[in-house]
Amino acid sequence: MLVLAHTGRESARRSARQVIERLTAAGIAVRVTDAEVPDLQCPGATVVPAGPEAAKGAELVIVLGGDGTLLRAAELARPAGTPLIGVNLGHVGFLAEAEPEGLSRTVDHLVAGEYRVEERMTLDVTARENGTEIVSTWALNEVTVEKAARERMVEVVIEVDGRPLSRWGCDGVVCATPTGSTAYAFSAGGPVVWPEVEALLIVPIAAHALFARPMVVSPRSVVAVELLHAAVGAHNQAGDGAGDGEPGAAEVERAVLWCDGRRRFDLPPGARVEVRRGALPVLLARVHGLASAPPGGGEFTDRLVAKFGLPVTGWRGRPAR
């Protein structure tokens, strides 16, 4: 098993050492990356390069940290087809399976092989300039096309399956998976989508338009975001004429592409970004609800209630059938 941790936190380093000691005591081979060895100081682990081969052949990747650490781990686990399991040492930690107080119990399940694996939909992303591919990447949570300058909007046209849908002057556009519906898309006003639902979400960010609502489309759809060439200063939000006499339209319509808030790519004016269902899913290991989870996404419902502190007082239970 490969163990990854947010080594900038003492709690994560301490938990990682605890996990490694318990796994090695159970006779399970453990890997850590060379980037984390100085911080973890675990002599019982095998050191591997912190690259795309780190998770190859591993049974699991155990991640100790927040959602950001798990997203980093997903970049290693996805190409290897290795499941991830997260222990939340961050804030919300929506992707994590366990909290710190349940760490020992979670490790016991893993040692005994008592876990199930879920597939989570991903996104494949390409960006082109004048028909030439300039970016090819992927995301687990979301892809965002955002303005590069705080004082300016971007002008975009949204296309779904080869047909134009709407033109927006906006701060950006989020294209998200169901897994990402509780992340940036949620903060931008998008709906929460249960992970069993197969869909793509399109969520505008602060759009100046009458029709600018979050939309849910087929998982087979291809969503395109095209950056338009607009007039100089056409979207000076301050309204003070600051756009007068400034450089050309390239500055006005320059934008950035973010994938999972981790990988950033500059987009030139006129760029086209296409988002579709990813060819490879991310695999998440689960130890909760192995036999007792109610049908219809009950485990996810409980996770929503716990993570967001939703009020459920007055619920009288499921009626007898």
Place the predicted regions along the sequence by residue:
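Proline-centered loop/turn at the N-terminus of a beta-strand
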Residues: 29, 81-83, 201
